Amino acid sequence: MNSLFATTAQGLEELLRSELETLGAASCKVALGGVHFQADSRLLYRALLWSRLASRIVLPLNVFSVGSDGDLYRGVQAVDWPSLFTVDKRFAVYFSGTNAAIRNSQYGALKVKDAIVDSFTRHGARRPDVDRQQPDIRIQAYLHRDQVMLSLDLSGSSLHQRGYRGAAGQAPLKENLAVAIVLRSGWKPGTPLLDPMCGSGTLLIEAAMIAADCAPGLTRPYWGFSAWSGHDEAQWQESLDEARARTQTGLAQTSSRFYGFDIDGRVLEKARHNARRAGVAALITFQTGEVAQLINPLPEGQRGTVVSNPPYGERLESEPALIALHNQLGRVMKSQFGGWRLSLFSASPALLGALMLRAERSFSAKNGPLDCEQKNYLLAETATAPGSVEGQIATDFANRLRKNVRSLQKWVEREKLDCYRLYDADLPEYNVAIDRYSSWVVIQEYVAPKSVDPERARQRLYDVINATLAVLAIPASRLVVKARERQKGKSQYEKLAQKGEFLLVEEYGAKLWVNLTDYLDTGLFIDHRIARRMLGEMSRGKDFLNLFAYTGSASVHAGIGGACSTTSVDMSRTYLEWAEKNLRSNGLVGRQHRLIQADCLAWLAMAQETFDVIFIDPPTFSNSKRMADTFDVQRDHLALMAQLKRLLRPGGTLMFSNNKRGFQLDEAGLAALGLRAQSITDRTRSPDFAHNRQIHLCWLISHADKDTFKSCH
């Protein structure tokens, strides 16, 4: 009897133990990452041919402590290597793990190799050759907590490599993990199995091989035991003959049928190719189709199991398409597959909440480095009638959004706007803002207070996303989701992503670039559009200054409005480059359109030029490392006005705006400075922000001895 160890993915050890016991293995003992068991040659070959869950089956040779490289060398030399393979066989060492003595796995492999070679030369034999590509003998050395387990790998390549998969989709499952998913799904051989997002078909192919009693190892071209001295060729051939006979009989007798769907026809061709190589193509029907159009292929009354590994994203809030996909899947399951079992395996378990289904059981497993979860559902026997997303969830939100769209439609068409707000936390339980940017939509989720259950908040976001897609009839690929909280200092300028994708939009004749994904804000504050149009009208023949210029949209309006010059000052090089791009897109090039990178407050204190029109929309608060002092708009606005007065020409106009809730303009202080102000907040608030009286505050300010407001009415 041989003492063996079968490895598997973490989380699958108990399944592997059960499988090995079914094959006849004795003394099975579960360990982290595998199962120890006893087997003679016949059972060893059966396990190699028939185990669907094992990654490797190895023969442990020695376990020893390593406190130095000398300990490693001596522990390897303690094995009688010439009794395991002959000198004419090529070998390779695969070493994993480090400790204080062996700090590099390559060094560890080298020491093991040297010890093996020296074992042969010590007995007068020549040095055996090393072959890393396809060795005859594979030696595994695993170092963990100063203990080395030295083994002979009898598998060769990993057992999950059945030999049938020539190509896979973007994120293939390993075959042994696919088997675990199928086994845990509750599917029984002889009953239908369907995968609505089957990719390269691994789940279906492995299930078909189970149903047809196909030995998974039959199609493997390479084994690690062939050059092992303990190999029994006659017993191996007998095991092969038995496996071939069982496979042939099983394929002829199975009544199981399998159905695979995927939106990508090219990936389905790979799936068909894989199924042919595995010998189960006759059992599986592959068809191109997307989840939303999925129809139950079985006659009414027949039941089966749906198993799938849906796509997932690392950042949930940036993947509205995935949220929509999961919600569509849940709706289709309820409407088309009443009475079926559903089992989904995901590296983003939170996405499964979008199914709107209650799981009856869940399992944990690793897919490579990813922590994953498999959830099983029993679908209600009575199928629900297909309906729109908003008809089933978030009805009040969907109705409000639809009402807003209708009420704004004529105004949007009249103003010829690409960008406008559709919803602004109108209903407290759906605390989001929804903005349209041409054919794109941005949902900004205001972060819920800590008193709100995170799961409930996430579910409401799912509802908002799906209802928005349905009401606006846009593809999920045109939806962007962001989380917004109260901004502090420079956080509004921090980068969220690295896509670098820009969209050109129009606003009252100005062409402006927006970026919907990379930053919290898009590069265009759409609540200020009327203020920007006013600046354009005010700036004809004038010199225009834009402080805290951001992406320069106000400078663009001034420029196309006929300003003699524009000067845009901002501390961010990124935003000034963006502003230059905006200016160029409107033909505003040349020395008369200046871009200055500077701390606006420091620049203002030093500036000697004067201007006819000044626009300033400062941050509510700033403590940037590149600014000498903090800035608070309520505390410091009078000092700011005193500096701006120096730069404002006689008869000139200053537009001052800010977003601080509860801000109070110190009109008495302004009068003491020789300035006067006129509130234009209501005039600059457009219909899409009519219900948000706190979106911004805005004033026109001029020298007290000049009447400059008449032309702005």
From Swiss-Prot:
Primary subcellular site in the record, as a coarse category: cytoplasm
Reaction(s) catalysed by this chain's protein: guanosine(2445) in 23S rRNA + S-adenosyl-L-methionine = N(2)-methylguanosine(2445) in 23S rRNA + S-adenosyl-L-homocysteine + H(+); guanosine(2069) in 23S rRNA + S-adenosyl-L-methionine = N(2)-methylguanosine(2069) in 23S rRNA + S-adenosyl-L-homocysteine + H(+)
SUPFAM superfamilies: S-adenosyl-L-methionine-dependent methyltransferases
GO cellular component terms, A-Z: cytoplasm
Listed InterPro entries: 23SrRNA_methyltr_KL, DNA_methylase_N6_adenine_CS, RlmKL-like_Mtase, RlmKL-like_Mtase_CS, RlmL_1st, SAM-dep_methyl-trfase, SAM-dependent_MTases_sf, THUMP_dom
Subcellular location: Cytoplasm
Record has S-adenosyl-L-methionine as a keyword: yes
Record bears the keyword Manganese: no
All residue ranges annotated as the THUMP domain in the record: 43-154
UniProt GO MF annotations: 23S rRNA (guanine(2445)-N(2))-methyltransferase activity; RNA binding; rRNA (guanine-N7-)-methyltransferase activity
Superkingdom, taxonomy of origin: Bacteria
Regions crossing the membrane: none
Keywords, comma-separated and alphabetical: Cytoplasm, Methyltransferase, RNA-binding, rRNA processing, S-adenosyl-L-methionine, Transferase
EC number: 2.1.1.173, 2.1.1.264
Family to which the UniProt record says this protein belongs: Belongs to the methyltransferase superfamily. RlmKL family.
PANTHER family: RIBOSOMAL RNA LARGE SUBUNIT METHYLTRANSFERASE K/L, RIBOSOMAL RNA LARGE SUBUNIT METHYLTRANSFERASE K_L
Role of this protein: Specifically methylates the guanine in position 2445 (m2G2445) and the guanine in position 2069 (m7G2069) of 23S rRNA.
UniProt-recorded name of the protein: Ribosomal RNA large subunit methyltransferase K/L
Organism: Sodalis glossinidius (strain morsitans)
